[in-house]
């Protein structure tokens, strides 16, 4: 196989692993939301905040990606009229350093951050 073919396969593997993390099928992945985003979306009660988090999770699972994000590791979406950014970062299994190989789930932990553009 050519180097280009190998690169495409690697990119698609990373994209599929990112999809699994976004859709809740990767038990090692973490999903975090910035306090600014939760403050803007959530209400004054714990119940309202939990409902805002549920809406964010639904948007995360169904977001679409621009062609310039082949690994599906960055997206912009709208939740309740608020622009929300989604970014996937790749860490080692201890969450201390960057992963040496994001295509290898045995050595990579994904952290998905949901934030406002101002938080980026």
Which stretches of residues belong to each language-model region?
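Short, compact, well-ordered microdomains
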Residues: 73-120
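Compact soluble domain cores
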Residues: 4-78
